Amino acid sequence: MMSLDVIFILKSVIIAIVEGLTEFIPVSSTGHMILVGNLIDFKGQFAEMFEVVIQLGAILAVVVLYWKKIKDSVIEFFKFIFTGGKEGKIGFRFGMNVIIGCIPFAIIGVLFYDNIKSLFNLQSVIIGFIVGGILLLVVETLFRKKNHSTDNIDKITPIQALKVGTLQVLSAWPGMSRSASTIMGGWIAGLNSPTAAEFSFFLAVPAMVASSGKDLFEFDYSIMTPTLWIALVVGFIVAFIVSIIVMEKFVNFLKKKPMRVFAVYRIIMGVVLAVLAFTNIISV
């Protein structure tokens, strides 16, 4: 019995590593967790809740890594309000941009929550991988080097934030990737790649906390056992640690290289999965 518990915890660690590796790069963490979950038989009611919790571990990584920026922006946001705009203008503008950027995703999430949840399957992931990869190639080719004068998140305008937020809606489809969608939105809006990626990190905090809250509130905690609680805590910690490492390296990567390598990876992965599904080697 104990060996089965250890194996289950090891499976949870694998999923948490996958989450940490893929949450903030444009390859879709949800898609990879669904895929790996199918391969190692990590599925079911707990697995769905586990994925929500470890995504919060990844979000905590954003808070820790950018704590000073978040703290200063919150303080300046309220300074601006209470001083009638005499102080804290930069922090207020940044906070409003984050709010504006989250509005489109929030509307879609509220109106189509059940429809979105019904898409969480391997077939949707395959479509998301391929379509998202093609879009990434096209948008990078057309917009990445065109008028990208915005090189700092404090210089982002409300219109730019809205454009990024509108593209974030694409990530409601499993396999599309929230990171890919927001970075593409950043390119279209005139942000350079590192700035688009960093703004994507900040948009992730309210978007994912809000979407996770409903799932955690509705979860049936009566099924929880000591093994499941251990898996949950360990998974959260692992996702947090891996996410911090990946975020720093990803921003540095974007300062030097294009993202087409991720686009090609997505397309190849999608085609391979489609072939495996068509030949019944894996089930969708």
Swiss-Prot record:
Per the record's keyword annotation, is Hydrolase included, yes or no? Answer: yes
Catalytic function, reaction form: di-trans,octa-cis-undecaprenyl diphosphate + H2O = di-trans,octa-cis-undecaprenyl phosphate + phosphate + H(+)
Q: Write the Enzyme Commission number(s) for this entry.
A: 3.6.1.27
Q: Which residues cross the membrane?
A: 6-26, 46-66, 94-114, 119-139, 183-203, 227-247, 262-282
The topology of this chain with respect to the membrane is: Multi-pass membrane protein
Cellular localisation? Cell membrane
Keywords of the record, alphabetical order, are: Antibiotic resistance, Cell membrane, Cell shape, Cell wall biogenesis/degradation, Hydrolase, Membrane, Peptidoglycan synthesis, Transmembrane, Transmembrane helix
Q: Which biological process, per GO, is one annotated for this protein?
A: response to antibiotic
| CC terms in the record's Gene Ontology section | plasma membrane
Q: What else is known?
A: Bacitracin is thought to be involved in the inhibition of peptidoglycan synthesis by sequestering undecaprenyl diphosphate, thereby reducing the pool of lipid carrier available.
| Record NCBIfam families | PRK00281.1-4 (NF001390), undec_PP_bacA (TIGR00753)
Question: Which protein family is named in the record?
Answer: Belongs to the UppP family.
- Protein's recorded name: Undecaprenyl-diphosphatase 2
Q: Which organism is it from?
A: Clostridioides difficile (strain 630)
Gene encoding this polypeptide?
A: uppP2
